[in-house]
Amino acid sequence: MNEMKMDRRVWLQKHILAMVYVMGALFGVMVIRYAWLQLVEGDALSERMRNQVGYDFAIQSPRGTITDRNGREMAVSLMTKSLYIDPNHVSDPDALATDLAPLINMPEQEILDDISAGGGFVWVKRRMEHDEYEAVRKMVREKSYTDCVGFRDEAKRYYPNDILGANVLGFVGTDDKGLDGIEQGLDGLLKGEVKEKYLTTDRQNRPILDSIFSSQRQYKGEYCKNVELTLDAGIQFIVEQELDRAMAENNPQAITCVVMNPKTGEVLAMASRPSYNPNSFYDYSPEVWKNRAVSFIYEPGSTFKSVVAAAALQEKVVSPNQVFVDPGYVMVSGRRIQNWSGTSFGTVTFTDVVKQSLNTGFAQVGLRLGAQKLTDYAKLFGFGTPTGIELPGEEGGLLFNPDDMRDSDVATMAIGQSIAVTPLQLVTAMSAIANDGVLLKPHIVKTITNVDGSIYEEKGTTEVRRTIESATDKTLVGLLEQVVASGGGKK
């Protein structure tokens, strides 16, 4: 009896020991497998899991706001919906295209082309209008397209004043990139940065437990800047009204106006006609996108005579009371140069030459200065090189090489021909005369601020150089005042 109990005890001990060995072996295998998965395949499996249940979404912080000098908003960013399709889950492409096309104003074939591209994601229409979004959302629910049609939130640039300041502001493309004007010139500051965020999605790749909208609403960007311009929207409005009136009354090909504070170099208004609405820039010819104040060069004509008079007075080749004989026209190197009236003014002083803008007198003054000095003074007043204003596409203008100039070139340059300038260059030069002969760098950006309101950069007055002596400038200003008081400018 005792032997049977002993045998049974030994048998149990052996089986228990065997089970312990087996369980220990299994546990060891599990530990080894766990270690293998963690240490060897862990990164790959983790990435596989992330790809199965979500994706990394790039969030672009909304562009900074652009305002005028008084805080009036001129360019802002609004949240909008963008439409996409998952071609892998489209069961009837023709039906979907037929239903979508009239709601988003797109040809059915274009939508079919998007679907045929395949894959799990394709944009159909970016940054829809609100009524478009509401119409599509309703249709998607009613016709059960939720498996293949979805929306994502994106920022859309909006210009609340429509055409006002359009050629200065520019516009933004589909991918939030500035394509003209300040939007392009300061794109790196306005655009801010892109931030990656992981979103958990459902089987149709739609975000769950979070949304792109809430992510973008919370994420304001750490580096995008707001820009305050030197423009005064009130002055800008008056200028553009007058340009529209001039276009209607005179029917010119184009017209440009620049208003500048000569004591600071701040541009208070800058406008061109024809122009466009940056909210729908794609409806206009690219030619009207250009800011003619900085990108268009032309012969300045009699307006350049102020610079010639400044040079002549500074170099003392003339004095206000010096006498000239005006025959009505002069011949220079075989070229006839005559007065605007086509008549002779007889014996006149240099003051009269300036007051009446006599081409014959200025041609003689130009020849007295000579090609080198005439060109040197043009450069002193900023002609021949870009001003450096914060706008893209600025032209530098055209100046003759003095060594290549004939007498006729010198004479015609003295009356504002044989030279090409931008409207901004001309206004900058005239502002120097109004500023005691000191040339300032024009600027259209007043302040750049961070998202928290702190100052990132504050623009101020930048003195470039003195063009003529103060005494000379005072004499010149006295002559120019007579032009508008009793001379040719009175008209």
Regions inferred by a protein language model and the residue ranges of each:
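Periplasmic/cell-envelope proteins involved in peptidoglycan metabolism and beta-lactam response
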Residues: M1-F281, Q372-G384, G488
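Beta-lactam-recognizing serine transpeptidase/beta-lactamase-like catalytic domain environment
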Residues: E3, A75, D202-Q218, I255-S302, ...
